[in-house]
C-alpha cells in the first residue's frame, strides 16, 4: 500500500554480546599424536567462535560471563550529554548555519525543559551543542594498538562542547516547542502547574554563541529574570499537547488532560488571542497535537480515548472535527507524527504498536501499516524530514527504533536465525538510555537524531540512515 520502493542496506543492531571467558592454555607433550593435535585445533577454533561478539536483541537474557558492548562501526556519530535535572521534552531550533550540513564537526541548538525535584527549581534550557565530530570506528580499529600521545591530543581537540543559558520556569516542563516568528525564535512551554507560556529565546541563543554575552546574561538574569511574552491560564488542567503551525507563523494549538484544545493566534499588540471555546470531540486527555504540514487550518490530535481526530479550525469548535479514527489503538494513544511529504500519519500507543494511517482513507479503513517491535508503551515517533518512508520511534522499553517502510523482505536474502522474526522494515535499534521520553530528527543535519531520557541526551547518526 506504500508508494515508496527502494533497496536498503541490511538492518543493524549496534549492541553485541561479548563473552568474557578465561583463556585456557594447554602445553602439549612432544609425543602427542596427530589426532590429538587436530582435536586441540578444533577446540581452539570452537572457543574462538564462542568468544566472537554476537548481535544482541533487546530482552535477550545475558549469561553471567556476558556483557554488552557498543559497536562503534554502526554509528557515524554518537555523543552523550547531561543537563543535571532530566528533560521530559525538547525541540531542535532551526539555525542560520545552512541546510543539508554533512561536514564534521557539526553544531546543533536545542531548547529543553527540566523535570526537577521541586517545581521552583525548573528551568528552560537553551543549549548549543558544538564540535560534534564523527565517532565512527571500523571493526578492525577496536583491536589496533593506540598511538597514545597523538590520540590523546586528537581526542582533546575533538571533545564535544555544550553551552547553556537558563530561563527560570515555574513547574516541570511537560512539553516545549520552538518556532521562528518575525525575526525572533519563540518557545512555547506547557507547565505541570496548568499554564502555557510563550518565551522569546533569541537573546539566549545569541548568548550561547558568545562567552561575553553569556556572562552578561547570567549576571543580568539574577535580578532581572526573563519573563514570558504571554501566559495562558485558561486550561482547567495541565497538559501535553502542544504544536506551532508550520504554515501560519505564530499560530499555536495546546491541549490538556481535561480533553480541551485551544487555538492561539498572534495579535497586533504583540501577544496572542486564545479562542476560549475549546475544540469539541475528544472524551479524555489530549496526548499529542500535529498541525498539517501544508494546510494552515488543519491539525491532528490523539487521545487517551483511543481516537485520532482531524480538525478544521475554520469551522465552529463544536463542528471542527472532520475525521475520526475510532479505536485506533488497543490502549491510550501517546504520540502522532504527520509526514511532511506524503499523506500519512504515524501513531504510537501504550499497546506498543506503531500504526501508519493513510489520510485519503482515514475514517473508513484500518491502518495501512502496523508494526509490533516495542515491548512497552511508545513515547515518541517522528517521520524523517528528508526521506518520507523513514521514521523513528522510542519507547519505555529503552529502545529507539529506526524504520524504512519502503523495505520488503528479499526471499533470497540470507538472514541470521536471531533476526528472522524482526520486521524487515526495522533498520536499527539504538539503546543505552533509560526512560526515553522524546526524539527528533534534525531538519538541517541529515540523518541526525537527538533523544532525551532520564539519563540525559544522545545525539547520533547511524550508518543506516
Walk through the language-model features, giving the residues of each.
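Per-blade loop-tip surfaces of WD-repeat and WD-like beta-propellers in eukaryotic adaptors/scaffolds
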Residues: 130-133, 154-156, 193, 198-229, ...
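Canonical WD40 repeat/beta-propeller blade segments in eukaryotic WD-repeat proteins
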Residues: 87-94, 171-178, 236-244, 283-291, ...
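Blade-level signature of beta-propeller repeat domains, shared across WD40, Kelch, NHL, RCC1
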Residues: 438-465
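Residue-level detector of Asp-centered blade-edge/turn motifs that repeat once per structural unit
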Residues: 94-97, 106, 180-183, 246-248, ...
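Structural signature of WD-repeat beta-propeller blades
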Residues: 79, 88-91, 174-177, 185, ...
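Beta-propeller domains
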Residues: 21-91, 95-166, 194-225, 267-271, ...
Amino acid at each position: 500500500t506504500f508508494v515508496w520502493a527502494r533497496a536498503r542496506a541490511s538492518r543493524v543492531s549496534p549492541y553485541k554480546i561479548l563473552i568474557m571467558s578465561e583463556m585456557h592454555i594447554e602445553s602439549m607433550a612432544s609425543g602427542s599424536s596427530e589426532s590429538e593435535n587436530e582435536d586441540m585445533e578444533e577446540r581452539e577454533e570452537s572457543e574462538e567462535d564462542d568468544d566472537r561478539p554476537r548481535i544482541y536483541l533487546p530482552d535477550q537474557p545475558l549469561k553471567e560471563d556476558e556483557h554488552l558492548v557498543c559497536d562503534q562501526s554502526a554509528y557515524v556519530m554518537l555523543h552523550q550529554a547531561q543537563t543535571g535535572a532530566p528533560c521530559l521534552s525538547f525541540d531542535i531550533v532551526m539555525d542560520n548555519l545552512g541546510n543539508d550540513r554533512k561536514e564534521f564537526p557539526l553544531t546543533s541548538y536545542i531548547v529543553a525543559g527540566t523535570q526537577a525535584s521541586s517545581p521552583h527549581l525548573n528551568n528552560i534550557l537553551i543549549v548549543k551543542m558544538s564540535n560534534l565530530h564523527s565517532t565512527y570506528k571500523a571493526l578492525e580499529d577496536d583491536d589496533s594498538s593506540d598511538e597514545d600521545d597523538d590520540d590523546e591530543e586528537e581526542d582533546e581537540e575533538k571533545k564535544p562542547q555544550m553551552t547553556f543559558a537558563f530561563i527560570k520556569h515555574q513547574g516541570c516542563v511537560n512539553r516545549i516547542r520552538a518556532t521562528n516568528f518575525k525575526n525572533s525564535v519563540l518557545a512555547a512551554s506547557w507547565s505541570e502547574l496548568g499554564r502555557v507560556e510563550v518565551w522569546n529565546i533569541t537573546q539566549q541563543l545569541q548568548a550561547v554563541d558568545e562567552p561575553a554575552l553569556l556572562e552578561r546574561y547570567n549576571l543580568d538574569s539574577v535580578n532581572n529574570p526573563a519573563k514570558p511574552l504571554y501566559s495562558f491560564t485558561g486550561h482547567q488542567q495541565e497538559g501535553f499537547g502542544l504544536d506551532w503551525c508550520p504554515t501560519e507563523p505564530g499560530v499555536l494549538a495546546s491541549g490538556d488532560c481535561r480533553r480541551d484544545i485551544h487555538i492561539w493566534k498572534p495579535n497586533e499588540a504583540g501577544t496572542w488571542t486564545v479562542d476560549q471555546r475549546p475544540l469539541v470531540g475528544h472524551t479524555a486527555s489530549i496526548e499529542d497535537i500535529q498541525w498539517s504540514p501544508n494546510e494552515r487550518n488543519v491539525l491532528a490530535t490523539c487521545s487517551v480515548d483511543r481516537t485520532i481526530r482531524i480538525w478544521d479550525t475554520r469551522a465552529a469548535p463544536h463542528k471542527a472535527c472532520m475525521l475520526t479514527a475510532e479505536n485506533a489503538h488497543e490502549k491510550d494513544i501517546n504520540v502522532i507524527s504527520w509526514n511532511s511529504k506524503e499523506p500519512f500519519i504515524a501513531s504510537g500507543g501504550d499497546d506498543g504498536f506503531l500504526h501508519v494511517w493513510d489520510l485519503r482513507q482515514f475514517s473508513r479503513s484500518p491502518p495501512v501499516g502496523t508494526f509490533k517491535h516495542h515491548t512497552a508503551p511508545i513515547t515518541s515517533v517522528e517521520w524523517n524530514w528528508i526521506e518520507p518512508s523513514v521514521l523513528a520511534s522510542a519507547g519505555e522499553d529503552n529502545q529507539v527504533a529506526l524504520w524504512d517502510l519502503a523495505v520488503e523482505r528479499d526471499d533470497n536474502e540470507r538472514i541470521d536465525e536471531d533476526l528472522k522474526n524482526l520486521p524487515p522494515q526495522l533498520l536499527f535499534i539504538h539503546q543505552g538510555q533509560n526512560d526515553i521520553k522524546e526524539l527528533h530528527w534534525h531538519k538541517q543535519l541529515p540523518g541526525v537524531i537527538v533523544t532525551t531520557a532520564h539519563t540525559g541526551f544522545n545525539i547520533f547518526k547511524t550508518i543506516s540512515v
